[in-house]
Amino acid sequence: MRELPKIFGDKSEDLATLFLEQEGFIVIERNYFARKLGEIDIIAQKDEVLHFIEVKSGKADFDPVYNVTPDKLRKVINSAHYYMKSKKIDVSFSVDALIIRGDEVEFIENVTL
């Protein structure tokens, strides 16, 4: 039976959260929606740096890393700025991607356009 995309996405974000916590990150928020700008899958902190993390996963032949597009990164960056401004936070930050391929997790820190 085929998993519904929302359920599969939630399971992937649960796995991503567990991975980040095991790596010493403190997860602050999940699925943060920044008005009309977009959504950030996970906001976490480690070593005085705030991380805005896009989670991509897949089961098929297509590598989910290719779903981290320039358009998606712009939305995450704009949402990150909105988050920090609305919370009055002024710290170093990083936009990252966490790629899940089956049971393999790849963390790509400081993704740029």
From Swiss-Prot:
The protein's name: UPF0102 protein SUN_0231
Pfam families linked to this entry: UPF0102
Gene3D superfamilies: 3.40.1350.10
HAMAP family, per the entry: UPF0102 (MF_00048)
Origin species: Sulfurovum sp. (strain NBC37-1)
PANTHER family per the UniProt record, alphabetical: UPF0102 PROTEIN YRAN
Family, per entry: Belongs to the UPF0102 family.
One function term, GO molecular function aspect: nucleic acid binding
